[in-house]
Regions:
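Membrane-cytosol interface motif
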Residues: 1-8
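Membrane-proximal, non-transmembrane interaction modules
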Residues: 8-115
């Protein structure tokens, strides 16, 4: 999965450890939004967090807990990116995004027998 590889790259950059929370959460948000757009087929990178939140309410395959966690991460990213809220050390949200991606990605069913 491309998004998971991008999260690994972001982690290795160590932006949060270098004190660049703004850039870290900007990149994290972009990775997550691209994934959401690809997975649920809407232009998430171009939408506001509020628009994405409204869209989530109409997605039948997205569990409430995953929806709430996704919105929490997007809001936190917005606060750090735009309001310059300080990020807590050690709370990079990469693992939270990784878990959401892993729990919401489509699983392909492979048949062992030709039909």
């Amino acid at each position: 999965e491309k998004a998971l590889r991008e999260l690994d790259i972001l982690k290795r950059k160590g932006l949060l450890d270098q004190g660049d929370a703004h850039q870290h959460f900007f990149e994290l948000s972009e990775i997550f939004r691209r994934y959401l757009g690809w997975r649920y087929r809407f232009p998430a990178p171009d939408w506001t967090t509020e628009e994405i939140t409204v869209k989530f309410s109409s997605l039948p395959g997205l569990e409430t807990q995953a929806r709430e966690e996704a919105v929490r991460i997007l809001i936190k990213s917005d606060l750090i990116k735009f309001a310059r809220v300080e990020a807590a050390p050690g709370h990079d949200e990469i693992e939270s995004v990784r878990k959401l991606i892993e729990s919401t990605r489509e699983h392909k069913v492979i048949s062992l027998y030709a039909e």
